[in-house]
């Protein structure tokens, strides 16, 4: 499959031929569910002249439907481009294809979509991860050369790990959220899914930087990372031992072998522990659900999106539009968020979760003040079956090693390091200080090359 770096050197005619090839592949592999239905019927001329990049269905593209894979937004057409889309168009790239996702980015399986589930391209009985499962499946199966997703608690890194591609979440505020449908405003971050680390750096350089349209955008200097990539830096890496011990045997053995290879290649490895990751899960789901309950209050059937026809008055219209439009997982998180923000429980849950968040960030900072990067798992296991997770709590625990990175606002990247005996991918996660993406990408490139040359 052609890489993003190679495609950026294509002529206009070669780009057109590439788009035709990708469109044909998407139709042939429609069963994967990587793309939502309406994309397959679009005219190729609607995508622009640039190199094609697939876009998750919660990022605004002017004149394209924006549905967040939800029934409640069926028929809604975005009136403007997200800032990341504007940046793509300015750099000889163009949006090409709407990627499937968990409804409103709430999930770890890409099975809660209104359009139906996305399948793992390496084993169709397994989940591709979520919520950016469509983005990961598209890149991993050759239906896209690169893709944009969003990461609120691991939604770029975990599906990248399950599908075997690179998933990179920049530090909070490094990439504009203007035009991203909000789930949890203090945690959401647009990220990239690519075939390799160099492509991730190239695409990141295009979309990163300060944006005055986004009040949470970080107004700090940004320098492109791709031209300065250096795989030869011998970095000091902190391995989170207690997290590696919590993974299953396949993942644990692959990560331990990777650590040995890093040592053999001159990296200084130190071992650290972080607090019990189940505390991260509790804090994350309280904060994320609270913010989601506020953000999703705008979907009321009045201003945009789907309106219920079964109503005799305004109150009934609100209730029926939301009851009919939202899926089960979204309703569950709205109810949880409303509960923890209610007057009797705000101090008991929400305030305590915010204190835990500050503590988590402090612990990461203590380690990163002494080390260049952190090395830890992306997920406790390889991709699992669609029916293996029986309860919402089990699903929430699949994000156990990724959500703390969002709580701390740090950058993280998922890099493939091996496969199990069934051919399912295993990835390692590297984490950097806030806004030190250059070091993160240098380390990831080095890790990628070590794995290729083993």
Curated annotation (Swiss-Prot):
Gene Ontology molecular-function annotations: ATP binding; glutaminyl-tRNA synthase (glutamine-hydrolyzing) activity
The enzyme's E.C. designation: 6.3.5.7
Transmembrane segments: none
Catalytic residues in the record: 56, 131, 155
InterPro entries documented for this protein: Amidase, Amidase_CS, Amidase_dom, AS_sf, GatA
One Gene Ontology biological process: translation
Keywords: ATP-binding, Ligase, Nucleotide-binding, Protein biosynthesis
GO cellular component terms attached to this protein's record: glutamyl-tRNA(Gln) amidotransferase complex
Recorded catalytic activity of this chain's protein: L-glutamyl-tRNA(Gln) + L-glutamine + ATP + H2O = L-glutaminyl-tRNA(Gln) + L-glutamate + ADP + phosphate + H(+)
SUPFAM superfamilies named in the record: Amidase signature (AS) enzymes
Name of the top EC class for this enzyme: ligase
Assembly and interaction partners: Heterotrimer of A, B and C subunits.
Role noted for this protein: Allows the formation of correctly charged Gln-tRNA(Gln) through the transamidation of misacylated Glu-tRNA(Gln) in organisms which lack glutaminyl-tRNA synthetase. The reaction takes place in the presence of glutamine and ATP through an activated gamma-phospho-Glu-tRNA(Gln).
Entry similarity comment: Belongs to the amidase family. GatA subfamily.
Name of the protein described by the UniProt record: Glutamyl-tRNA(Gln) amidotransferase subunit A
Organism (species): Campylobacter lari (strain RM2100 / D67 / ATCC BAA-1060)
């Amino acid at each position: 499959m052609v890489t993003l770096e190679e495609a950026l050197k294509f002529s206009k005619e070669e780009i057109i031929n590439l788009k035709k090839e990708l469109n044909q592949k998407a139709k042939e592999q429609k069963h994967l569910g990587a793309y939502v239905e309406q994309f397959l019927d679009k005219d190729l001329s609607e995508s622009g002249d640039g190199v094609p990049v697939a876009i998750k269905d919660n990022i605004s593209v002017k004149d394209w439907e924006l549905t967040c894979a939800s029934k409640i937004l069926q028929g809604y057409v975005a009136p403007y481009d997200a800032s990341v889309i504007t940046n793509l168009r300015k750099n000889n790239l163009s949006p090409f294809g709407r990627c499937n996702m968990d409804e409103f980015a709430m999930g770890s399986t890409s099975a809660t979509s209104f359009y139906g589930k996305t399948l793992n391209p390496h084993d169709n009985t397994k989940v591709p991860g979520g919520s950016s499962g469509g983005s990961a499946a598209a890149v991993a199966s050759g239906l896209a050369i690169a893709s944009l997703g969003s990461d609120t608690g691991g939604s770029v890194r975990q599906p990248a790990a399950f599908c075997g591609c690179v998933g990179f979440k920049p530090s909070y505020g490094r990439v504009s959220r203007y035009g991203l449908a909000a789930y949890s405003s203090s945690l959401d971050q647009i990220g990239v899914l690519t075939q390799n680390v160099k492509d991730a750096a190239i695409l990141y350089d295009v979309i990163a930087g300060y944006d005055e349209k986004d009040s949470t955008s970080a107004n700090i200097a940004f320098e492109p990372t791709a031209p300065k990539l250096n795989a030869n830096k011998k970095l000091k890496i902190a391995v989170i031992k207690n997290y590696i011990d919590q993974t299953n045997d396949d993942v644990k053995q692959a990560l331990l072998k990777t650590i040995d290879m890093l040592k053999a290649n001159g990296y200084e490895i130190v071992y650290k522990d972080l607090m019990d990751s189940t505390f991260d899960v509790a804090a994350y789901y309280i904060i994320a659900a609270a913010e989601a309950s506020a953000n999703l209050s705008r979907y009321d059937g009045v201003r945009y999106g789907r309106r219920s026809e079964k109503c005799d008055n305004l109150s009934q219209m609100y209730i029926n539009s939301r009851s009919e439009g939202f899926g089960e997982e979204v309703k569950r998180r709205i109810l949880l968020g409303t509960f923890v923000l209610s007057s009797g429980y705000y101090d008991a849950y929400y305030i305590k979760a915010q204190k835990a968040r500050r503590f988590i960030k402090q612990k990461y900072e203590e380690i990163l003040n002494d080390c260049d990067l952190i090395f830890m798992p992306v997920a406790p296991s390889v991709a699992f079956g669609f029916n293996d997770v029986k309860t919402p709590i089990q699903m929430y625990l699949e994000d156990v090693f990724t959500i703390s990175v969002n709580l701390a606002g740090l950058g993280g990247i998922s890099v493939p390091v091996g496969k199990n005996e069934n051919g399912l991918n295993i990835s390692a996660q590297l984490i950097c200080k806030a806004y030190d993406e250059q070091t993160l990408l240098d380390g990831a490139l080095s890790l990628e090359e070590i794995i290729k040359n083993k």
